[in-house]
Amino acid sequence: MTNLTLALDAMGGDFGPRITVPATLQALRLYPFLHVIMVGDRSQIEPLLSHLESDLLSRIELVHTTEVVKMCDRPVHALRNCKQSSMRLAIELVRDKKAQACLSAGNTGALMAISKVLLKTLPGIDRPALVSCLPAVNHKPVYLLDLGANVSCCSETLFQFAVMGSVLCEAVDKNPAPKVALLNVGIEEIKGNDQVQQAGQLLQQSPQLNYAGFIEGDDIYSGNVDVIVCDGFVGNITLKTSEGIARLLVHQLKKGLTQGFFVRLLAKLIAPRINSVLNQMNPDHYNGASLIGLRGIVVKSHGSADESAYLQAISLAVTEAQRRLPKMIEERLESILLDINN
C-alpha cells in the first residue's frame, strides 16, 4: 500500500487535542501506510504523545501554531484574519501537495470559505457541496447533499451535486450504478419549484447517471436510492432533524429497557443485538462530511465528536484519498457533459 499523508487540524472541535490526538493514534495503528501532519499548539499536543512507541511517532509530524478559528467566527473574518490558524495551515498542506487530504472538526463556514479559496473548485463545478451518509433500512448508507454549504441553488448546481454524489458513492461504496434522486415535496413530475424541476430535466438527459426521479422526505431512509440531492437549506434541516430523532429513539429505547425486572433481564440476554441496533442509529457512527467539488480532499468532523466518531471521519478521508476522489469527479463530469452536448 502506498503511503498516504493526512493533514489534521488538531485544534478544531469542542475538545481539540484531547479527542483529535488519541483518535489519530488509533488511526495510525489501524492504517500502517498512514502518515499524519498535526497542525496546532505544540504545548497541548506533545504531552499526549510522550509515551508513544517510536514506530508510530516516526509517522507523525507537528506544525506549530497557537491560532485557532473560533466556532463563532464568521467565514469572511476567518478567511481574512486567521492566516496562521490550524485550520488554514492544514488546508494549505493539501494545496501544496504535502498531504492528500485534510480533516477538521472546526467552524464549518470557515472551512468551506478557506477551502474554496485555497483549493479552488474542479473544472465544471460552480460550488463545492457538503455531503454525508445516513443509515437506511437495508443497512447500506444513503448519501445526502448539500448539507448547508449552499442554502440556495440553481438547477445547474443541483445537477452538479448529483454528479458529485454519484461519483462519491461509486468511490466509497464501490457501487457501480448508484440511484440518484432529487428531494422534493412529491414524486410527481409536476411537483416542486422551478430549480428542482429543471434539475430533474437535466438529469433525465444524462444517460451515465442512474436517475430515479423525485423522492419525498418519508422515503429518505428506505434504501430505495443511494444519493439524494437538495439545496443546503433543506439538507441541513433534514440532517439535523434526523440526528435529533435518532438520539431521541436511542434515549427512549435505553430508558424503556431499564423499567421492570423482566425487561432488564431480557435486555441483558439480547444485549449484543440491542447494541448493534443502537450503533446503527447513533449519528456518531456516520461522522464525517465531505466537502466535495474541490481540487483537494477536505473532510469535516462533528465538533462534538468523541474518539470513535473522529476515527470514523479519519477513515473517510483515507478512503477518499485512496480512491483519488477529486480526479474521479472531474473525469466523470467531463464525460457526462460531453454526452449531453453531443
Curated annotation (Swiss-Prot):
UniProt pathway annotation: Lipid metabolism; phospholipid metabolism
Top-level EC class as recorded in UniProt: transferase
Domain of life: Bacteria
Pfam families in the cross-refs: FA_synthesis
Subcellular locations according to the entry: Cytoplasm
UniProt keyword list: Cytoplasm, Lipid biosynthesis, Lipid metabolism, Phospholipid biosynthesis, Phospholipid metabolism, Transferase
EC code: 2.3.1.274
Keyword Zinc included in the entry's annotation: no
Record note on quaternary structure: Homodimer. Probably interacts with PlsY.
Family to which this protein belongs: Belongs to the PlsX family.
Protein name: Phosphate acyltransferase
Top-level taxonomy: Bacteria, Pseudomonadati, Pseudomonadota, Gammaproteobacteria, Alteromonadales
Gene name of this polypeptide: plsX
